Amino acid sequence: MKTFSAKPAEVTKKWVVIDATGLVVGRLATLVAMRLRGKHLPTYTPHVDCGDNIIIINAAKVVLTGRKRDNKVYYHHTGFIGGIKERTAKSILEGRFPERVVEKAVERMIPRGPLGRVQMGNLRVYPGAEHPHEAQQPETLDVGAMNRKNKRAA
């Protein structure tokens, strides 16, 4: 039997919406990264973008377990000498773009390269409940019901 290899023209992409209210960031990110890559499909091909288009709503209401909300630090560099900056997860979640916590968690689980950048383009994260993708008729995925550890009371 020959090994199956999906062609980009043969891939059919689904639209999935996930409500992140009360979900644990890492558990949500692993599931989203797997679906973005297409590893949940039997037709998965490593060099083809065969994953789903994923919409995450209420990303500002995610939960970090333990003391990570206060202790987890995100670093970035300005490009200037000595320009390393740091922010805690709490300051990002209470700041202007709280959806970046979820975006960074997923981004760091996707391979870095041209295909990874295309796959990250299939992810849309919104801090509130509204999203402009109703025309795509996304199906709802209840991540909290998949495993009792996926959801925490804030």
Curated annotation (Swiss-Prot):
Keyword Ribonucleoprotein in record: yes
Swiss-Prot/TrEMBL keywords: Ribonucleoprotein, Ribosomal protein
Keyword Ribonucleoprotein applies: yes
SUPFAM superfamilies noted in UniProt: Ribosomal protein L13
HAMAP family: Ribosomal_uL13
The protein's role, per its UniProt record: This protein is one of the early assembly proteins of the 50S ribosomal subunit, although it is not seen to bind rRNA by itself. It is important during the early stages of 50S assembly.
Protein name stated in the entry: Large ribosomal subunit protein uL13
Gene name as annotated: rplM
